Amino acid sequence: MTFKASVLTLYPEMFPGALGLSLAGRALEAGTWSLEAIQIRDFATDKHRTVDDTPAGGGAGMVMRADVLARAIDHASPPGDTRPRLLMSPRGKPLTQARVRELAAGPGAVILCGRFEGVDQRLIEVRGLEEVSIGDFILSGGEPAALVLLDAVVRLLPGVMGNAVSGEEESFENGLLEHPHYTRPQEFEGREIPQVLTSGNHKKIAAWRREQAEQLTRERRPDLLGAHPLAK
């Protein structure tokens, strides 16, 4: 089954962008996933192709119109489409590796890239949009966030990563940050590769990596400890 991504945006030329390269790009060419970037302005009805208006109650900036966006969503996601409808938004629920895995296991996603001050709340409610955030910071639009989300999802699709074990050992997959990595040369500016990693004792190596992952998580992301069954 091909993972189908439909992105609603004012800047379709931003796609596939970096997703046309490396793992995601090869998977796109192979048909493992598909991408359509839909111009929201095509669903405006006035000669100026207006997609926004002033906020009710006053205030700075502009708000994206519910009627225009609804037509765009209905075009991308007609009745019977089971793909989740996502709105990239700084006030959304933080994107987690668990949610990424859920999306990768599904048929695809319809992604709305917000602009200006945001989207009319009525659209979010009536079209059942899931608001998603990639972090506690503000971007100029939802497009970079959509690229981040899709990159995280596509790499988990079957056959995209050459070594499935590589993905299983990454940060967040087991509730911990990933352990440090080393490779040749053996010595670099006075620092040696930890001896245990060249010992050939796989049990000791696994224990060292787990210990390092736990230590890094305690130092940098203590909020993760206890939140995942494998991190306890």
Curated annotation (Swiss-Prot):
Major localization class: cytoplasm
Subcellular location: Cytoplasm
Region (Disordered): 211-232
InterPro entries reported for this sequence: Alpha/beta_knot_MTases (IPR029028), tRNA_m1G_MeTrfase_C_sf (IPR023148), tRNA_m1G_MeTrfase_TrmD (IPR002649), tRNA_m1G_MTases_N (IPR029026), tRNA_MeTrfase_TRMD/TRM10 (IPR016009)
Keywords per UniProt: Cytoplasm, Methyltransferase, S-adenosyl-L-methionine, Transferase, tRNA processing
Pfam families linked: tRNA_m1G_MT (PF01746)
GO MF annotation terms: tRNA (guanine(37)-N1)-methyltransferase activity
GO aspect biological process, one term: tRNA N1-guanine methylation
Taxonomic superkingdom: Bacteria
SUPFAM superfamilies for this protein: alpha/beta knot (SSF75217)
Coiled coil residues, start to end: none
A Gene Ontology term for the protein's cellular component: cytosol
EC number: 2.1.1.228
Binding site for S-adenosyl-L-methionine: G114, I134, G135, D136, F137, I138, L139
Catalytic activity as recorded in UniProt: guanosine(37) in tRNA + S-adenosyl-L-methionine = N(1)-methylguanosine(37) in tRNA + S-adenosyl-L-homocysteine + H(+)
Similarity annotation: Belongs to the RNA methyltransferase TrmD family.
Subunit-level organization: Homodimer.
Stated role: Specifically methylates guanosine-37 in various tRNAs.
UniProt xrefs under PANTHER family: TRNA (GUANINE-N(1)-)-METHYLTRANSFERASE (PTHR46417:SF1)
Protein's name in the database: tRNA (guanine-N(1)-)-methyltransferase
Phylogenetic classification of the source organism: Bacteria, Pseudomonadati, Pseudomonadota, Alphaproteobacteria, Hyphomicrobiales
